[in-house]
């Protein structure tokens, strides 16, 4: 939403029709319904493959993939098994001078160090730049602590 509010053209892709509908509702509630956005219900990897064939390029990519999912034919998708290929594929649609790439992971199987390693070994050799990674956590008001629930990795020039 932030990028739409700044005037960026946004493409939102999710395999779940319900998630795309929810994102549209959030855009409307944020008074951003009139800003440019392509709302696409599709498998993200298949969408990226088509964008590669079309020659489409993006200055920034934000990924928030599920930890686990099933395709329409019952195929099982696990982030731990597919994250490397998904990032490698997505690198091909980044522009020649991209701004950043960010990915979140909500699985215990991908620590911040692992996420950073994957992003560093897939994007840095091709695009240069640097990475940073951190843990995603939920604050616990009763104790003041934080419950770890995933990792985020960001690449930028």
Regions found by a protein language model. Name each.
Residues 9-14:
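Conserved SAM-binding motif I beta-strand of class I
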Residues 16-62:
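S-adenosyl-L-methionine
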Residues 41, 59-89:
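Mobile active-site "lid"/loop adjacent to the S-adenosyl-L-methionine
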Residues 98-157:
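C-terminal catalytic and target-recognition region of SAM-dependent MTase-like enzymes
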């Amino acid at each position: 939403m932030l990028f739409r509010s700044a005037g960026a053209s946004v493409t939102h892709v999710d395999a779940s029709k319900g998630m795309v509908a929810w994102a549209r509702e959030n855009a409307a509630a944020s008074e951003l319904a009139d800003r440019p956005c392509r709302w696409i219900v599709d498998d993200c990897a298949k969408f990226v493959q088509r964008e590669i064939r079309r020659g489409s390029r993006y200055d920034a990519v934000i990924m928030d993939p599920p930890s686990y999912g099933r395709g329409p034919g019952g195929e099982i998708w696990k982030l731990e098994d597919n994250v490397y290929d998904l990032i490698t594929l997505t690198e091909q649609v980044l522009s020649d001078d991209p701004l950043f790439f960010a990915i979140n992971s909500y699985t215990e199987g991908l620590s911040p160090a692992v996420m950073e390693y994957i992003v560093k070994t897939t994007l840095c050799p091709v695009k240069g730049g640097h990475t940073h990674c951190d843990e995603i956590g939920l604050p616990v008001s009763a104790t003041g602590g934080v419950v770890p629930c995933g990792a985020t990795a960001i690449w930028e020039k």
